[in-house]
Amino acid sequence: TIPDLITIGVFTALYFVLVAVATLFSSVALMGFGMILLPAVAALICGCVYMLLVAKVGKFGAISVMGIVVGLFLFVSGHFILSLAASIVFPVIADAIARAGDYRSKTGILASYVVFCYGLTGPILPLWFMKDAYVASLQARGKDSSYIDGVFAHVNTGTFFIAMIVVLVCALLGGWFGQRMLKKHFAKTGII
């Protein structure tokens, strides 16, 4: 419905703002690892927005649309097609998980949020799986070899697994915090 689409649009905009904050924080505070850990930082701070979206809309498609809009933005802004693919696949799976619990199961919604958070790994996956294309992309944008070496300084199999585990932990914490805020503050004020 139109009100649902407006709600999805508002929460997607809020999600974008929080991802921008996560980007700024990770690039300043996590020198050298900022890009690799960006999805984890975003997972940590975006739980409230996700939980509010699920509580307000509670229908299949809301989570998927938010993820797809993010993926389209990433793709249009110059990221690889892998960004778009991850931003479609993970949110649709997350939507299906939340739907399985009728958008009411706390555990199901938390699991859904964890899966959704992996959608934001799309921009960093090419670091490990499309290195040559990533290097060519950086060279095409005029980046010199020292910059490129800096980008790949911490990229190895170990950091891939560490990054994915940190996303899991941060998504669990961010989702748990979002659920607590939903119950403690938003439900009492009548927002949901």
Residue positions per predicted region:
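Membrane topogenic helices and adjacent juxtamembrane segments
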Residues: 1-27, 138-143, 147-156, 162, ...
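Alpha-helical transmembrane segments of multipass membrane proteins
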Residues: 11-23, 46, 50, 74, ...
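Membrane-embedded alpha-helical hairpins and interfacial helices in multi-pass inner-membrane proteins
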Residues: 35, 110-183
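Interfacial aromatic-anchored transmembrane helix boundaries in multi-pass membrane proteins
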Residues: 23-31, 35, 70-98
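Hydrophobic alpha-helical transmembrane segments
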Residues: 5-10, 40-44, 63-68, 81-85, ...
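Membrane-interfacial segments
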Residues: 22-30, 57, 61, 81, ...
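Cytoplasmic juxtamembrane interface segments
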Residues: 86-116
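Hydrophobic transmembrane alpha-helices
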Residues: 1-61, 65
